[in-house]
């Protein structure tokens, strides 16, 4: 069943960053949160816990490992070991804490730009050296430069941090790509940290393969960081997962401070249990809406701004739009904001090669998307 977005009037009463980040005359389609109502099982557990004043300190929560393992098996046929699912505050904290146990200051960490902007912040926070091997771009298609990647691996790389599925490109790495990364990592002694927060948002008919499930090598070299937050629209509840498949990685993660677990939210942890156990139907409905919106945005752009180029993503609710042909200068985001009063994400925050792109949030209503494109057109 299709999930209907809340009205714009309702959304403007919300207190999150999306609705407080810009003046009220700006239409916001930037930060990755949805305009959809939270699934009822999640609402129910939160109401139950709050109404019973059940908001104390978080203890152990084996329910979460079991819930994620069940979800991973249903959605991706991944055999997760529940005891090797660890809790953390959010994916950003998870990435930082994993970097802290897999690197020393000055070690080299590889990313592939354009990439979610906080990868740069996480690497800076842990005082390691950023190495960037950008994607190769051919039109609207992006591919990994494996020759350059192997050279970096061979030169003494410690960690390769990947975003799978990819934000902002909206693509899912293939089995062949993931296998090659895993084989190279095994050969050169590199740890692969895979941010898989967008994985539950894979579109029907597309295949997501968890990195740790791709091969024995992947299980040995990989660590996954993920959360229910993106797919179930509960980012403010602060709960995420760090998952390992091998005994060695599990033992390494056990050296993290115990506080990594206890800094998480008890409400967020139990909301995630409900999300993974009881919200498949809601998620499927959200995906129907998001994929429909992805096609609707393409129709709007093709009709009103045909020079803007956009490829339907394979996952998630983030559209990656090439506006280079519109001649908007070095910062198209600012032109749309100043002239159209519509806020997207500026491509330049994802990497130096992406300044002529914008990222548009699709998890809204058709009417909001139509108004956004109308404001874009009026900016030209």
Give residue spans per PLM region.
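Active-site phosphate-binding strand-loop segment of PLP-dependent enzymes
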Residues: 136-206
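Helix C-cap/helix->beta junction micro-motif
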Residues: 126, 187-188, 218, 340
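PLP-dependent aminotransferase-like
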Residues: 100-162
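PLP-dependent enzyme catalytic core of the Aspartate aminotransferase-like
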Residues: 150, 331, 335-344, 350-380
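N-terminal small-domain helix-loop-helix segment of the aminotransferase-like
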Residues: 2-90, 97, 276-278
């Amino acid at each position: 069943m299709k999930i209907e977005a809340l009205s714009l009037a309702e959304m403007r009463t919300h207190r999150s960053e999306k609705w407080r980040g810009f003046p009220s005359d700006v239409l916001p389609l930037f930060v990755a949160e949805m305009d959809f109502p939270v699934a009822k099982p999640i609402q129910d557990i939160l109401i139950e816990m709050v109404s019973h004043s059940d908001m104390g300190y978080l203890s152990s929560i084996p329910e979460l490992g079991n819930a994620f393992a069940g979800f991973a098996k249903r959605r991706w046929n991944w055999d997760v070991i529940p005891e090797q699912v660890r809790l953390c505050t959010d994916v950003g904290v998870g990435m930082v804490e994993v970097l802290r146990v897999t690197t020393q200051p000055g070690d080299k960490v590889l990313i592939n730009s354009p990439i979610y902007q906080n990868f740069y912040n996480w690497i800076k926070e842990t005082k390691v050296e950023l190495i960037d091997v950008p994607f190769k771009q051919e039109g609207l298609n992006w591919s990994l430069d494996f020759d350059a990647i192997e050279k970096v691996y061979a030169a003494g790389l410690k960690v390769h941090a990947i975003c799978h599925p990819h934000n902002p490109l909206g693509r899912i790495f293939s089995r062949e790509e993931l296998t090659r990364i895993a084989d190279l990592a095994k050969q050169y002694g590199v740890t692969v940290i895979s941010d898989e927060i967008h994985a539950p948002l894979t579109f029907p008919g597309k295949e997501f393969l968890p990195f740790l499930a791709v091969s024995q090598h992947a299980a040995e070299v990989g660590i996954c960081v993920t959360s229910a937050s993106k797919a179930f629209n509960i980012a403010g509840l602060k709960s995420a997962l760090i998952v390992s498949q091998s005994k060695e990685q599990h033992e390494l993660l056990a050296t993290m401070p115990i506080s990594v677990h206890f800094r998480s939210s008890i409400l967020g942890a139990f909301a995630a249990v409900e999300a993974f156990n009881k919200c498949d139907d809601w998620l499927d409905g959200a995906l129907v809406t998001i994929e429909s919106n992805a096609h609707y945005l393409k129709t709007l752009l093709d009709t009103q701004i045909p020079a803007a180029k956009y490829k339907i993503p394979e996952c998630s609710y983030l559209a990656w739009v090439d506006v280079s042909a519109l001649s908007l200068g070095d910062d198209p985001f600012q032109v749309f904001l100043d002239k159209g009063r519509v806020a997207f994400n500026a491509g330049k925050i994802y990497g130096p090669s992406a300044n002529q792109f914008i990222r548009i949030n699709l998890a809204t209503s058709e009417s909001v998307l139509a108004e956004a494109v109308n404001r874009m057109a009026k900016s030209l």
